[in-house]
């Protein structure tokens, strides 16, 4: 029985960042782990990992501990270690270009300026990495982007984001259970 899918949530390690916009990927992996009964309790290749079964498929859940912009330094060695092709990795991350409350699955493509995703693309040597984007919206006029993504969600945004994080975990589970990317995009993109 081989690992068929790696689910990577992007974020920054430590309690200081736990509820920030940039940690939406970590939040989804935590929800997915709870839903699947998987404990992320092993550190390997600079990442917190957990393995489990979904149907007959083994899956690897990953939270890189390298800080966002160096995520590829954890993901690429894990993919090589477990023999997982880039196309079998689902990267979950925040997206400034999607409004809060929006969700978008893509098969691959450019990083769209997301440095954590760009690090993964660079280290894997391909843009053919599926991803699940969580909309966080753009900062208000005059606010620095870095300050914005490293701050916790506002109360108003949290009301929009919480249901989307749950929906993102459902989308990831759908794929882990063997659902097609086309069907997942039709069902979950909004």
From Swiss-Prot:
Cellular-component GO terms for this entry: cytoplasm
Residues annotated for tRNA binding in this entry: 17, 67, 69
Documented EC number(s): 3.1.1.29
GO biological process, one term: rescue of stalled ribosome
Subcellular compartments: Cytoplasm
Keywords, in A-Z order: Cytoplasm, Hydrolase, RNA-binding, tRNA-binding
Reactions performed catalytically: an N-acyl-L-alpha-aminoacyl-tRNA + H2O = an N-acyl-L-amino acid + a tRNA + H(+)
Entry's Gene Ontology molecular function annotations: peptidyl-tRNA hydrolase activity; tRNA binding
Positions bearing the site annotation: Discriminates between blocked and unblocked aminoacyl-tRNA: 12
Active site per UniProt: 22 (proton acceptor)
Function: Hydrolyzes ribosome-free peptidyl-tRNAs (with 1 or more amino acids incorporated), which drop off the ribosome during protein synthesis, or as a result of ribosome stalling. Catalyzes the release of premature peptidyl moieties from peptidyl-tRNA molecules trapped in stalled 50S ribosomal subunits, and thus maintains levels of free tRNAs and 50S ribosomes.
Family to which this protein belongs: Belongs to the PTH family.
Subunit structure of this chain's protein: Monomer.
NCBIfam families: pth
Name listed for the protein in its UniProt record: Peptidyl-tRNA hydrolase
Gene: pth
């Amino acid at each position: 029985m081989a690992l068929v899918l790696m689910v990577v949530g992007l974020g920054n390690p430590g309690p200081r960042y736990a509820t920030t916009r940039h940690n939406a990927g970590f939040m989804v992996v935590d929800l997915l782990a709870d839903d699947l009964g998987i404990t992320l309790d092993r550190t390997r290749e600079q990442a917190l990992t957990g393995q489990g079964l979904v149907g007959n498929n083994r899956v690897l859940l990953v939270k890189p501990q390298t800080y966002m912009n160096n995520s590829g330094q954890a993901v690429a060695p894990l993919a090589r270690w477990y023999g997982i092709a880039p196309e079998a990795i689902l990267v979950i991350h925040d997206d400034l270009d999607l409004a809060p409350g929006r969700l978008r699955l893509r098969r691959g493509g450019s990083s769209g300026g997301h440095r954590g995703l760009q690090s993964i693309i660079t280290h894997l040597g391909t843009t053919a990495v599926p991803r699940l984007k969580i909309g966080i919206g753009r900062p208000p006029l005059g606010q620095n982007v870095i300050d914005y993504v490293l701050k916790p969600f506002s109360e108003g945004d949290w009301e929009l984001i919480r249901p989307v994080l749950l929906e993102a975990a459902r989308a990831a589970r759908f794929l882990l259970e063997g659902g097609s990317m086309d069907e997942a995009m039709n069902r979950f993109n909004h």
